Amino acid sequence: MKRIVLETNRLLLREMTLSDMGALSSILQDERVMYAYNGAFSDKETFAWMQKQLQRYKDYGFGLWGVILKDTNEMIGQCGITMQEYKTAQVPEIGYLLAHKYWHKGYAVEAAMACREYGFNTLKFDELYSIIRDTNVASQKVALRNGMNPIDYIVKHYREVDMPHLVYCVKK
């Protein structure tokens, strides 16, 4: 049974299982979706991404969850909370990634807001972050609508590329 973590008006956020690999692959292997990661993932990278989420569920009790449309039961993306390195600490980050055809419909904001409430009320974090590539304006707008403000500018080295990022934060 797939554990449902959060429910909103239109969405369920639930732990993923290996049976979600098909839906996850179609998202992570889409160049349009993955432009902030410097390109689509290979099959190997997609499987490693899934394994990382499954391990996060075991280690922390949270991670990136599958975003499911209640009306159709379709997995349309991922949203959740992960621990990410920022400066010299691990901080809780709200992350989101949706299939291209579901962009600009309010789903990312709806899921991110639910994660913010979960992070504060259930996980008892005092601060939540979103670390977003500087070119990813749509995700920056989601962070702002989620009550976050930009607090820093960092460079992350990922896939052999230096990628500037903006750090957003909201306090409880």
Where are each of the predicted segments found?
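Acyl-donor (CoA/ACP) binding surface of acyl/acetyltransferases
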Residues: 1-34, 68-172
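Conserved GNAT-fold acetyl-CoA-binding loop/helix
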Residues: 32-52
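Short, conserved alpha-helical segments within structured domains
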Residues: 41-45, 63, 90, 135
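A short helix-loop-beta-strand connector motif used in the catalytic cores of GNAT acetyltransferases and
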Residues: 53-66
